[in-house]
Amino acid sequence: MTDTRREQEKDERRKLQEQSRQNEAETMRLLAFEAGRQLAEIPKEAKGNEPLLENYKSGLQETRKELETTPDATKSTNANRLERDVERAIIEAQQVREAVGREKARADEFHRHAEPGETYRGRVIGRTNSYVIQADDSRPGTIILHERAAVSGAEKVKMNDHAEISYPHGRAGIVRNPQAAQHQRQRQMEKTGAGREHGR
């Protein structure tokens, strides 16, 4: 295969990936708008993401207009609560953006939410009322948002600390400093090694 052909294939893959990202972003915008229109809770994917929160807010505003023509006290109360929630979420997203500002220039993705079963190691680059924000060492340029309420020990993590945050049991996270985590892995390896020798 020639170098020219390889470059063409590489460009095609890049274009397909970009198109896929754009389609996914458009789908997320539509879902956020529809969630707002249906007076549903703010979608998890929208939290920490200003553009999606703005789409959600637009959906809420459309429902608000409908409520002006056909009043419904329950829907109106729910809309008021969700409007307050989305305003708080937008402020939170702005705080996340500010905290991540230094890292954003290098970031491949603006952010990702922590996933069950994963372990994240890296420097804590920001904290808000709802999130611990971490630069992921294993994926340079990727920022991880950890929900503080779901992370045991989140209050102990300070700015610029190097921390390990793992999710061994679903959405509940555990914070460990890297030295303690390394020590625990070493002990586990010693136990398994000793167990093999003992079994001989």
Curated annotation (Swiss-Prot):
InterPro entries reported in the protein's UniProt record: KfrB
Basic and acidic residues: bias regions: 187-200
Domain of life: Bacteria
Keywords assigned by UniProt, alphabetized: Plasmid
Any single Pfam family the record assigns to this protein: KfrB
Taxonomic lineage: Bacteria, Pseudomonadati, Pseudomonadota, Gammaproteobacteria, Enterobacterales
Positions of region (Disordered): 1-27, 42-79, 169-200
Protein's name in the database: Uncharacterized 22.8 kDa protein in nuc-osa intergenic region
